[in-house]
Regions:
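N-terminal subdomain of nucleotide-sugar transferases
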Residues: 1-52, 359, 370
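Conserved donor-binding/catalytic core segment of Leloir-type glycosyltransferases
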Residues: 4, 195-213, 219-222, 233
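Carbohydrate-associated surface elements
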Residues: 164, 183
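Nucleotide-activated donor-binding/catalytic signature segment of Leloir-type glycosyltransferases, i.e.
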Residues: 245-263
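Short alpha-helical donor nucleotide-sugar binding micro-motif in glycosyltransferases
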Residues: 262-263, 270-275
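Aromatic "clamp/platform" in nucleotide-sugar-dependent glycosyltransferases that forms part
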Residues: 283
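Short hydrophobic beta-strand element within catalytic cores of glycosyltransferases
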Residues: 300-303
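Conserved acidic donor-binding segment of nucleotide-sugar-dependent glycosyltransferases
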Residues: 315-326, 335-341
Length: 372
């Protein structure tokens, strides 16, 4: 089966990168025997300096075409036209040797909208996977909603990466997506946790230091927990770093909260393997890949009722804190400290392997393609 993945591109003079979710799916499908190519659009504004135009290259053993355009900040009519032209150019370049895809699979609203307008009279089935947090609401902004409706209308199948996102898409567009999650690299996160060997209980968290992740709530809850020797390690960086550092001092936990910044997956996986519990109390999560990566290492997790994780967190792998506030989160963290060893790290890891590994997601997608 020939599959064209339509992805977000992030390109400069020195490197070519794709959105990680799209690349992970492309690699999974290729490993499952599909003939996969990638057509990517870099539609960021001129502030993200890079060469304008098209480029052909190979990445991870796949033919790739990238077209750079500048349309993201423009009004819908103008940006839509530019995006469509960029998509047509990408399709022309990626198929310039006569290759014809059986399936064109676009990811994210803006990219899907651009390729929907560029399909022409192709016989290929058109599939859209929605990941965007902008659609994870019952009232998307007008531009995003228009792009989504245009793409979904032309799609043979719409996929959402979580049940919460699917419900919001149905509410705002009337389209009922099928749910297929993102791929998690189970090879990187394969070493199961042995728990902390440092003499104190270790909570760990991961996410961008931005408002929606509510690390201020997590730190406040951490300061309220019973065990004053426990540690909290946080991976990620962002605009709230200085504010959160100051909050640690104010709460009296600066010596027990460790900020690790952005780190490669391999570094994060090593920390998960010597931690006891993963905890993150986001306001909203479209999917929740950080939870899945932690679970892949066998860690039980604590989450707020934030959407995406509610589709996979259950009594066998963690706790969902309903109507989450600092007191309720602290109570959940206290309880988890007492019962964390009762969870089976192997069972938690197996759940991830069965549902979010490259093999599992590739099988779901190929079965879906064949059903169209």
């Amino acid at each position: 089966m020939k599959v064209l993945i339509c992805a977000r591109g992030y390109n400069s003079y020195s490197e070519n990168k794709f959105g990680s979710f799209e690349l992970d799916q492309a690699k999974a499908l290729k490993a499952a025997g599909c003939d996969v190519r990638i057509a990517s659009l870099d539609l960021r504004s001129v502030k993200s300096f890079r060469p304008h135009g098209a480029k052909l290259f190979r990445s991870n053993g796949m033919h790739c075409a990238t077209v750079n355009s500048f349309s993201s900040i423009l009004p819908q009519k103008i940006s839509g036209s530019l995006g469509e032209k960029a998509a047509k150019a990408a399709l022309k370049w990626i198929c310039n040797d006569g290759w014809k895809p059986d399936v064109i699979h676009a990811h994210f609203t803006e990219i899907a909208d651009a390729f929907a307008g560029a399909l022409g009279n192709t016989d290929a089935k058109f599939v859209v996977t929605e990941h965007s947090s902008l659609m994870n609401t019952q009232n998307p902004d007008a531009k995003t909603l228009a792009q989504a409706k245009n793409a979904y209308l032309k799609a043979d199948k719409v996929i959402a990466v979580s049940r919460a996102l699917a419900d919001n898409i149905r509410s705002s567009t009337g389209v009922q997506p099928e749910v297929v999650g993102n791929v998690v690299d189970t090879k990187v996160f394969e070493k199961l946790t042995t728990g902390s060997d440092s003499g104190y209980f270790k909570y760990v968290s991961c996410g961008n230091l931005v408002d929606v992740k509510r690390f201020d709530l997590l730190m406040t809850a951490f300061s309220m927990t019973d065990d004053k020797d426990a540690r909290l390690t946080i991976f990620g960086d962002g605009v709230k770093k200085a504010e959160l550092t100051h909050l640690c001092e104010k709460l009296g936990v600066k010596d027990r909260v460790i900020f690790k910044g952005h780190q490669p997956r391999e570094v994060i996986a090593k920390e998960y393997a010597v931690s006891d519990v993963f905890v993150l109390a986001s306001r909203a999560e479209t999917f929740g890949v950080s939870f899945i990566e932690a679970m892949c290492c066998g860690l039980p997790v604590i989450t707020s009722d934030c959407g995406g994780p509610q589709g996979f967190v259950n009594e066998l792998n963690g706790v969902i804190v309903e109507n989450c506030d600092a007191q309720k989160l602290a109570q959940a963290m206290n309880r988890m400290r007492l019962i964390s060893r009762s969870y089976s790290s192997r069972r938690i890891h197996r759940f991830v392997e069965d549902n979010f590994s490259a093999q599992a997601i590739a099988k779901k997608l190929i079965d879906l393609y064949k059903s169209l």
